[in-house]
Amino acid sequence: REIKAIAKNRQATLVSYSIIENKQGEESQLYVWVVNAEGKINFRQLDLIEIKQKFRTSVASVSRNSLQAAAGGLDLRNPRLQDYIVSFRGDLRAKSENYRRKLGFPRDAYKMLITPIKDLLPQDPEELVVFIPQGSLFLVPFPALQNSAGEFLIEQHTLQLSPSIQTLGMKQPAAIDSSQALIVGNPAPMPDSLSQLSGAEAEAKAIAKILGTTAIIGEAATETTAIARMQEAKLIHLATHGLFDEHQGLQSSLAFSTRDNQDGFLTAEEILDLDLAADLVVLSACNTGRGKITGDGVVGLSRSFLLAGAQSTMVSLWYVPDLATSALMTDFYQQLQGDLSQPQALRRAMLNTMETYPSPREWAAFVLVGQ
């Protein structure tokens, strides 16, 4: 009853994936629940053993570099699937003029995760589809998945991720109050000799101009200053280095200035101690959606911000390129100045960025997670 009410109140289609084991402890079934915006529940059941056999060749064809990951088949909770997905993200990072023709994984993943439920998804691309994955599936870059015609999923639908049904809540997200924005870019000096990010500084200044505020840049961008401002902000945008720890997710961190002998790292564990009221936290940094994989998602920066009180986060799944990321982010905030929702604004920004930077490595890294 709750999931039906949430779907109706949010006017969204909810897609929940659940992996079922047999008596031998093997992943044997993939259960998929789809709840449309009218509250109607549909259920699809997929045979994972059959899927393993069907996609083994396709997985191997992704690239020679993913052969080792593919050798384990599609065991959806085997740690090797994380390597498999990482290899796909690696392929996205590698520029290729023949991307749509050569890269097999996004089409295989589309066939596995989207095709069985495609008839249940909304026809209007502006209508929201919220994916609620399990385990390593949380790292699948859904916007970059492709159908047989080479069309990306983000071209077909407005997308968002959520760790759980409960995270979505019953209410529509409130409009972001950009008058209480914290914008940070290119802290200096960086800890551990991390490189300065001139593109992140330009990005922060451009976004601050759109929002009518001033960005915190360079030596002013200390961890102490950021924490103090975060707890008052309704919108937080952090353009800096992100470091993830896939073994101890709570040690994933964001880099800030080391001025005044500060260590310069704000960890996911430290974020849990904050009391936030932000409608949106944007982590414009590398790998901010990564962390330790568990059965119910990723333990890392995104989850910590949500648990600390943020309504939504925007995070990345791989090393993001400077210029394309700056273009995507500034476009996203420009789109938000209208009456678009956060997922709609991100979709528009991705489609616009795609025109200048056609490779998915440039535009598909970021996902919205949360309410």
Question: Model-predicted segments: where are they?
Answer:
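An often Trp-containing, charged/polar helix-loop segment at the C-terminal end
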Residues: 324-371
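Residue-level detector of buried hydrophobic side-chain packing
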Residues: 15, 32, 129-131, 184, ...
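A short acidic (Asp/Glu
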Residues: 118, 137-146
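Peri-functional-center coupling elements
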Residues: 23-129, 147-220, 324-333
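Catalytic cores of nucleophile-dependent amide-cleaving enzymes
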Residues: 161-174, 234-331
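Functional beta-strand-loop-alpha-helix junction segments that form "active/interaction loops"
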Residues: 1-2, 99-104, 191, 196-250, ...
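Active-site-proximal beta-strand/loop segments in catalytic clefts of secreted hydrolases
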Residues: 17-19, 132-135, 157, 184-188, ...
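Two-metal-ion RNase H-like nuclease active-site motif
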Residues: 10-24, 236
